[in-house]
């Protein structure tokens, strides 16, 4: 019996409906990521790709479990990739061990490796993340518009570097945040001896880059949540305010809100 092949182009390929852990050396560090091939994968048909980033200290296995994407149609149609943060942290946080775009380049390398083995729809590459992973998703949202069609940030840890040196291109953007979040408060603050941004500042960056007219439609959602859809944007911007604490929300159901938003978006 041979050991499982964990290289970036595994042989045999990952079977539809299953997930495997793969590894690559990236810029001198050994990096790891999970790849799940959709239940209905066909080499004839291009598949969207969804990257999912967990919080500080999260293993990709743990995030893949609580993200609950198995409750959505993503499990049927999307190649889902859960990368592991280096020492379980993502760039732009004060505790991160990666800097200067290192994690952005890592994600693009993963995409290239997966694209070499599977039929990827490069027009439908998405990112979602929780907490530190949400902050990193926002980094991708304003630095990797050439790669991603849409991003979704949940309870994001928006440390100041998240909105630094952003590219000006628009991006389909969903932000979900708890108005009672005590860890990453809605109004911003300090943590780990570093400042983090109010949600309105991060939102404002996306409203500016999407040339929105700053007005919005508001509608009530389950669990006392409020959805704000902004008007006049080049690409869609939506904010979901949830009256709970720092979490991956159950009401409204985060995986379905996220996938319903992301899956309809294209890069061009």
Question: How does the language model describe each region?
Answer:
Residues 1-49, 128-152, 158, 201, ...:
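A domain-start/cap signature at the N-terminus of enzymes
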Residues 20-40, 44-126, 135, 139, ...:
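Serine-hydrolase catalytic machinery in alpha/beta-hydrolase-like enzymes
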Residues 51-55, 155, 177-178:
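The conserved beta1-alpha1 loop
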Residues 63-70, 157-165, 221-229:
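Alpha-helical scaffolding within the catalytic cores
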Residues 72-74, 166-169:
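Short, conserved loop/helix-junction motifs that constitute active-site signature segments
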Residues 172-176, 195-197, 207-268:
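C-terminal catalytic histidine-bearing segment of alpha/beta-hydrolase fold enzymes
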Residues 181-184, 246-248:
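Acidic catalytic loop of the alpha/beta-hydrolase fold
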Residues 186-197:
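Short, flexible/disordered intra-domain loops and linkers
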């Amino acid at each position: 019996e041979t050991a499982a092949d964990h290289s970036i182009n595994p042989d045999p390929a990952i079977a539809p409906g299953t997930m495997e852990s793969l590894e690559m050396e990236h810029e001198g560090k050994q990096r790891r990521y999970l790849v799940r091939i959709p239940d209905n994968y066909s080499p004839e048909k291009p598949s969207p790709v969804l990257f999912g980033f967990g919080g500080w200290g999260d293993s990709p296995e743990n995030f893949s479990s609580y993200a609950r994407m198995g409750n959505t149609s993503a499990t049927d149609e999307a190649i889902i990739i859960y990368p592991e943060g280096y020492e379980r942290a993502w760039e732009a946080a004060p505790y991160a061990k990666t800097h200067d775009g290192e994690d952005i380049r890592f994600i693009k390398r993963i995409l290239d490796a997966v694209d070499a083995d599977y039929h990827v729809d490069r027009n439908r590459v998405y990112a979602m993340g929780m907490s530190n992973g949400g902050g990193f998703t926002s980094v991708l949202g304003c630095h990797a518009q050439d790669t991603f069609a849409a991003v979704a940030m949940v309870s994001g840890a928006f440390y100041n570097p998240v909105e630094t040196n952003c590219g000006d291109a628009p991006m389909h953007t969903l932000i979900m945040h708890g108005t009672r979040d005590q860890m990453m408060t809605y109004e911003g603050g300090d943590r780990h001896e570093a400042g983090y941004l109010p949600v309105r500042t991060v939102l404002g960056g996306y409203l500016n880059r999407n040339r929105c007219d700053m007005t919005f439609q508001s509608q009530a959602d389950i669990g006392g949540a409020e959805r704000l859809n902004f008007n006049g944007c080049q690409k869609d911007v939506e904010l979901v305010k949830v009256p709970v604490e720092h979490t991956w929300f159950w009401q409204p159901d985060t995986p379905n809100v996220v996938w319903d938003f992301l899956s309809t978006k294209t890069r061009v």
